[in-house]
Amino acid sequence: LETEFNIREATLKDVSAISVLGRNTYREHFADIWHDIDSFLNADFSNDAIKSCINSPLSHRYLLALRNNTLIGFAKLNINSELNGMGKPCIELQKIYLKKDSVGNNLGSGLIERVMELASELDSKYVWLDVLKNNVQAPKFYQRHQFRIVDEIPYKTDRYEIGMFVMVKRLKDS
């Protein structure tokens, strides 16, 4: 099992690969919580939506994990994102998506490490995220990386009321 990978920021050349991986991994992990998953995927992972984010580096960033120049995972960040009571500057880790066969190879940890480096470079005081309450493994993963649950918020799909945990990590030098 190959565990070597590298991480870099996305460019416009990566739009299609991000769209395909985002759709596929979301469907693998979360298809059971939607009746009409395609509407969600078409909005969230359209080429136009991804291009818009890549063209707005002061607001959004995609960090890509590649193995042998093939996209195997990514993180999407919202820069200067507000979180109640935390003030700016914060970075929201909006999503980390990994190919199923890449889970457990330190890929997620590598992406988190790069997110923290970028947050430090951008003088952010906190990185925060929200995670589905029914996603049992994800909160544990983030807690291993020193994120802590600070709140619960409602979240609902066209099928279920699920709820989310809000998790925060304070950067060491802030």
What residues fall within each predicted segment?
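Acetyl-CoA-dependent GNAT
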Residues: F5, E9-V15, S19-D32, I37-D101, ...
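Conserved phosphate-binding and hydrolysis motifs of nucleotide-dependent enzymes
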Residues: N69, G73, N106-G108, Q146
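C-terminal "cap" of GNAT-fold acetyltransferases
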Residues: G87-I91, K125-S174
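Active-site acidic-Proline motif in GNAT/NAT acetyltransferases
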Residues: K99-D101, N105, K133-N134
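Conserved acetyl-CoA-binding loop-helix of GNAT-fold acetyltransferases
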Residues: G104-E117, K140-R144
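Short coil/turn segments at alpha/beta junctions that flank glycine-rich nucleotide-binding fingerprints
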Residues: N105, E121-K125
